[in-house]
Amino acid sequence: MESNGASVQYNRWSEDNITLQEPQSRSRLLGIYNRVFTGRLVIMFKIAASLTVMVVMYIAGYITGFYVHQCG
């Protein structure tokens, strides 16, 4: 069975000497993933975006409720 380009090499006399080599494109993708989806700035951005969405939903509900329950 072939894996997706990763190769495992081991020394048959020592099971502690195992190395895993990833293809270069995979390590680039991991670097991009780590830069885009992790980190303090990204977490703060996600929190700010979710708070903004909640405020917009609250305002939309308030306006909708105002016009639905308006006596007149």
From Swiss-Prot:
It is found in: Cell membrane. One of its GO terms (biological process) is nucleate erythrocyte development. Homooligomer; disulfide-linked. Residues 1-40 are extracellular. It comes from Danio rerio (Zebrafish). GO terms for cellular component: plasma membrane. InterPro entries: SMIM1 (IPR031744). It is a single-pass type II membrane protein. This is Small integral membrane protein 1. It holds the Pfam family DUF4731. Regulator of red blood cells formation. Its main location: membrane. Residues 62-72 are cytoplasmic. Keywords: Cell membrane, Disulfide bond, Membrane, Signal-anchor, Transmembrane, Transmembrane helix. It comes from the Eukaryota. Disruption phenotype: Mild reduction in the number of red blood cells. Belongs to the SMIM1 family. The gene is smim1. The chain crosses the membrane at residues 41-61.
